[in-house]
A protein has these predicted regions:
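C-terminal subdomain of the subtilisin-like protease fold in secreted/lumenal serine endopeptidases
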Residues: 252-259, 313-314, 387, 401-405, ...
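Short, small-residue alpha-helix embedded
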Residues: 378, 413-429
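Active-site-adjacent substrate-recognition loops and nearby beta-strands
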Residues: 175, 267, 288-336, 347-409, ...
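Active-site core segment of subtilase-fold serine proteases
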Residues: 136-220, 237-254, 258, 353-403, ...
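Short helix-loop-beta-strand segments that form the rim/entrance of peptidase-like active sites
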Residues: 212-237, 258, 431-448
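Substrate-binding/access-modulating region of protease and related hydrolase catalytic domains
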Residues: 227-313, 399-416
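Protease zymogen maturation seam
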Residues: 76-162, 174-177, 398
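Autoinhibitory N-terminal propeptides
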Residues: 1-52, 56, 118-131
C-alpha cells in the first residue's frame, strides 16, 4: 500500500494537540483538519444569533443534543472571534463531524439574509507535509553551496529591509551560519526528542530565513516561533498569533508566511478576518505560500491575493520544479496564485553546524508521483522509508545526519525566495514601499512558466541554479 501522507500527518498533528480532538474534512474527504464539536463565529451579537439558531435546529432534531450547545470561549479577543460548542468533541471518529455539519447548515438562512458567512469550522492552520513542505529535508553535500547562492549585496543597517517570518523558531546553532548574521528572533522550543533525534518540522523557520538572506542580504530578518507545536495552530488562535508577532516586532516591510489551510470556500478564513483588515491598512506586504495539495482549491491566507481589496497587500506564491520550467508536482495552482518561484530541491541552512544532528524519516517515498507528474520528483526521490508510513512493517525507517545545510521542497520555500526578491528590488531601486516594489518586480522581472498547461508569471533569482529533472519512462 502506498503511503497515506494526509492521514499520517493527521495522526502526527493530533498527537501534538492531545486535548483537541480533530476531524478531517470536508465531510469524509482528506483536504483539511478541524476541531471537533465546535464552530467558529464572530463575537458579540452575531455569536448569540448563531448560538440560538444552532440550539433551535438541534432541538428539532431527535438525534442531536441541544444541551451541548453553548459558548466555549473566548468571549472576545483581538481577532473578534469566539467558539461555540455544538457536541461532545470526544464522540465519533476522525472522518468528519456530523454535529458541526448540522450546525453550519442551521445558520444558512441567517447567512443569506446577512450576505456573509456567520459560522465556520475551526480549522488547523499548519506547515504539514500536505500543506507547505512538499517533502522532508535531505542533507546537502558539504561541498554544495546554498541554492540560491548568496547575492553579493552588502548589508547596510540604514537601508536594510525588515522581513518578519512567522513560523517555527530558530535552531540553537543558527548563528554558526554566516548567512544568518542579520537574523534574530525566537528559539525553537524543543529541537530533539528523548533519543536525541531531530523532531519533524523543526528548522523550517531557520531554512526560510536562510533563503531570504541568500536572495536579499540587505535584510534584517526576525523569526517568530508562532508555529513551534508541530507546525500547527487552531484557526481560532492563528489571528492572535499573527497580531502577537507584529506587536512584538512592529509591522515589517515584508511578512513571509509559509502556513495556511484550505477550507472549501472562496471568501477567506474567519479566524484571520480582523488581522487581514488590519494588514490592508498598513504598508506591509504579506508574501504567503499557496500550499502543496496539487490542487486549485484556495489555500488561506495566500488566496486573499485574489479577493477585492487585498490584491496589492498579499502576494500568493506557488512553486516551480527544480529546472524552473514548470510547476512542481505538488504546488497548488489556479488564478488565485499570483506568481511562481523555485521551490523544489532548494539548499539552505537547517542545523548541525556545530555537530551532526540525526533525523529519522517520518514518511516513506512513493513508487510514482502521487500527483501524476512524469518527472523524478520529490514524491519518489531520494527514496526512503518512514516511521509513520511503515508502522507495523518490518522495514526499518531511514536515518540521516544533518551537518549544516539541507535540501527541502515546497511552496513554503518558494515564498521566502519571492519575499527576498521583493526586498532585493527595494534595495536596488531605493524603493521604501514594499507594495510598490512588488508591482515593479512583477512588471519588469517576471518571466513565464507552464503550470498544468497554463502560462503563469515566474520569478527566478539571479543566483539560483536550475537542477535538471529526470524524465520517467512510461509505466514507471
Amino acid at each position: 500500500m502506498p503511503p497515506q501522507r494526509f492521514h499520517e500527518q493527521f495522526d502526527q498533528i493530533q498527537r501534538s494537540m492531545p486535548d483537541v480532538p480533530l476531524a478531517m474534512g470536508p465531510d469524509d474527504a482528506a483536504e483539511f483538519m478541524y476541531e471537533k464539536g465546535v464552530v467558529l463565529v464572530r463575537d458579540g451579537e452575531e455569536a448569540q444569533v448563531v448560538e440560538d439558531a444552532v440550539r433551535a435546529h438541534f432541538t428539532a432534531a431527535p438525534d442531536l443534543d441541544q444541551e451541548q450547545v453553548r459558548r466555549a470561549g473566548p468571549l472576545t479577543n483581538r481577532s473578534g472571534i469566539t467558539r461555540i460548542r455544538v457536541a461532545d468533541p470526544g464522540e465519533g471518529g476522525r472522518d468528519g463531524d456530523r454535529a458541526v455539519v448540522h450546525a453550519l447548515r442551521s445558520v444558512r438562512e441567517h447567512e443569506s439574509r446577512a450576505g456573509r458567512r456567520m459560522a465556520a469550522r475551526n480549522h488547523v492552520v499548519h506547515i504539514a507535509v500536505n500543506a507547505c513542505p512538499g517533502d522532508e529535508p535531505v542533507p546537502a553535500p558539504l561541498s554544495e553551496p546554498p541554492n540560491p547562492a548568496a547575492a553579493g549585496t552588502p548589508h547596510d543597517p540604514a537601508t536594510s529591509v525588515g522581513v518578519l517570518v512567522v513560523d517555527t523558531g530558530l535552531m540553537h546553532d543558527y548563528r554558526s551560519c554566516g548567512l544568518l548574521a542579520h537574523t534574530e528572533g525566537d528559539a525553537q522550543v524543543r529541537e530533539r526528542d528523548d533519543r536525541g533525534i531531530l523532531q519533524q518540522y523543526v528548522g523550517h523557520g531557520t531554512f526560510i530565513a536562510g533563503l531570504v538572506a541568500a536572495v536579499a542580504p540587505n535584510t534584517d530578518i526576525t523569526v517568530r516561533g508562532s508555529l513551534d507545536d508541530a507546525g500547527a495552530v487552531l484557526e481560532s488562535e492563528f489571528g492572535e498569533k499573527l497580531f502577537e508577532a507584529v506587536d512584538a516586532s512592529g509591522w515589517p516591510d515584508i511578512l513571509s508566511l509559509s502556513a495556511g489551510t484550505s477550507n472549501g470556500r472562496t471568501d477567506g478564513l474567519l479566524g484571520v478576518e480582523t488581522f487581514m483588515r488590519e494588514l490592508r491598512a498598513q504598508r506591509t506586504l504579506l508574501v504567503a505560500a499557496a500550499g502543496n495539495n496539487g490542487s486549485d482549491n484556495p489555500f488561506w491566507p495566500a488566496a486573499y491575493a485574489a479577493l477585492p481589496g487585498w490584491e496589492d497587500s498579499v502576494l500568493s506564491v506557488g512553486a516551480l520544479r527544480s529546472d524552473g520550467e514548470s510547476g512542481a508536482c505538488f504546488t497548488n495552482h489556479g488564478p488565485w496564485v499570483k506568481v511562481y518561484a523555485p521551490g523544489e530541491r532548494l539548499t539552505a541552512p537547517l542545523t548541525g553546524f556545530d555537530s551532526p544532528v540525526p533525523y529519522v524519516y517520518q514518511h516513506s517515498t512513493y513508487d510514482a508521483c502521487r500527483y501524476g507528474s512524469g518527472y523524478g520528483c520529490t514524491c519518489q526521490s531520494p527514496a526512503h522509508s518512514g516511521v509513520l508510513s511503515d508502522e507495523g512493517n518490518a522495514a526499518k525507517p531511514d536515518q540521516v545526519m544533518f551537518e549544516g545545510y539541507a535540501q527541502w521542497s515546497g511552496t513554503s520555500f518558494a515564498t521566502p525566495v519571492t519575499a527576498g526578491l521583493v526586498a532585493a528590488r527595494m534595495t536596488a531601486h531605493k524603493e521604501r514601499d514594499p507594495r510598490a516594489a512588488r508591482r515593479q518586480l512583477l512588471a519588469s522581472e517576471a518571466g513565464s512558466a507552464q503550470v498544468r498547461g497554463v502560462g503563469v508569471p515566474a520569478l527566478r533569482p539571479p543566483t539560483w541554479r536550475p537542477v535538471p529533472v529526470v524524465r520517467q519512462a512510461p509505466g514507471l
